[in-house]
Swiss-Prot record:
Enzyme class (EC, first level): isomerase
Function summary: Involved in D-xylose catabolism.
Assigned EC number: 5.3.1.5
Protein name: Xylose isomerase
Assembly mode: Homotetramer.
GO BP terms: D-xylose metabolic process
Keyword line: Carbohydrate metabolism, Cytoplasm, Isomerase, Magnesium, Metal-binding, Xylose metabolism
UniProt binding sites for Mg(2+) 1: E181, E217, D245, D287
Cofactor details (free text): Binds 2 magnesium ions per subunit.
NCBIfam families per UniProt: xylA_Arthro
GO cellular component: cytoplasm
Length: 387
């Protein structure tokens, strides 16, 4: 298998990823700003399928209408020249100080109304550029102290905002779906809708739940100590995996945004195995930050590494599933039984079945080994290239 990516692999990158200048809370930028046009061109050369953007990534905050149109025109020309796509866009409701207490859930009503108008304006642009998915990350929607935010009321305001956006795209005839991106903390001390599970529960309370799904990010779930492939499996099970952000994370700490494959390699293997075996058809979107130690050449090497690592893991996962010994080990671990309904015959038949309780030999069942260790070692062998 070739590890050279092509547009058919559907790899995408945010302008803010390779465009990150290395500025953090403890140090200034280590790289110059990147022109979005150059970003499009270089990613196309690397084999990417598309780019994504926050409004302020493409159009600097405070630009005049004339300047705005100029930025959009140059960007569109770069897309046309390279064949790159824009499958997703989002709104920056976290950088400007006006959003210090959030956008959709700011205590200040004027800020909430401004956040909605800013979002709607960028939805219009996203649709013009062909985006079908609109991501919402509420990085500033939260609090650091208990009395500062009535969370129940804040969730009312969050619901109001998403319901209004759903009403807007429906009234405009847009083929737009929203993907909520969970994160437990950072930059706020505690962020609303912190995990995939929280977001899925919230979506069911919206007026048009069919328009809303999730955009889980590897590092965000792992910051909460959760199993990312399990979260993705539940999102797929719910039919709500509308988008995904791929990167790397090493345990429960700040949001590292490492290139995909760095950090928890086992989780990355199981994630790729799941996405490919489940037939996920959306973009494989990389939301990472090239370390501030890197110069511009290192930026592109890091981006290329994201795609290469995914393709390597895809090959290893396919080999794992095709291995006859693995298939036998899966049967020995009773995965085929898990796929069988427990009581398809109904509750009355279950109650009448003495082998299910009265005559069930619990000691014999308890003595049966599950052979999970052998199965897991086979997976490790494939992951490490030993088979």
């Amino acid at each position: 298998m070739s590890y050279q990516p092509t547009p058919e692999d559907r790899f995408t990158f945010g302008l803010w990823t390779v465009g990150w200048q290395g500025r953090d809370p403890f140090g200034d930028a280590t790289r110059p700003a990147l022109d979005p046009v150059e970003t499009v061109q270089r990613l196309a050369e690397l084999g990417a399928h598309g780019v994504t953007f926050h409004d302020d990534d493409l159009i600097p905050f405070g630009s005049s209408d004339t300047e705005r149109e100029s930025h959009i025109k140059r960007f569109r020309q770069a897309l046309d020249a390279t064949g790159m796509t824009v499958p997703m866009a989002t709104t920056n409701l976290f950088t400007h100080p006006v959003f210090k207490d959030g956008g959709f859930t700011a205590n200040d009503r004027d800020v909430r109304r401004y956040a909605l108008r800013k979002t709607i304006r960028n939805i219009d642009l996203a649709v013009e550029l062909g985006a079908k998915t609109y991501v919402a990350w509420g990085g500033r929607e939260g609090a650091e102290s208990g009395a500062a935010k009535d969370v129940r009321v804040a969730l009312d305001r969050m619901k109001e905002a998403f319901d209004l956006l759903g009403e807007y795209v429906t009234s405009q005839g847009y083929d737009t779906r929203f993907a909520i991106e969970p994160k437990p903390n950072e930059p706020r001390g505690d962020i609303l809708l912190p995990t995939v599970g929280h977001a899925l529960a919230f979506i069911e309370r919206l007026e048009r739940p069919e328009l809303y799904g999730v955009n889980p990010e590897v590092g965000h779930e792992q910051m909460a100590g959760l199993n990312f492939p399990h979260g993705i499996a539940q999102a797929l099970w719910a039919g709500k995996l509308f988008h995904i952000d791929l990167n790397g994370q090493s345990g429960i700490k700040y949001d590292q945004d490492l290139r995909f494959g760095a950090g928890d390699l086992r989780a990355a293997f199981w994630l790729v195995d799941l996405l490919e075996s489940a037939g996920y058809e959306g973009p494989r979107h990389f939301d990472f930050k090239p370390p501030r130690t890197e110069d511009i050449d290192g930026v592109w090497a890091s981006a290329a590494g994201c795609m290469r690592n995914y393709l390597i893991l895809k090959e290893r996962a396919a080999a794992f599933r095709a291995d006859p010994e693995v298939q036998e080990a899966l049967r020995a671990s009773r995965l085929d039984e898990l796929a069988q309904p427990t009581a398809a015959d109904g509750v009355q038949e279950l109650l009448a079945d003495r082998t299910a309780f009265e005559d069930f030999d619990v000691d014999a069942a308890a003595a049966r080994g599950m052979a999970f260790e052998r199965l897991d070692q086979l997976a490790m062998d494939h992951l490490l290239g030993a088979r």
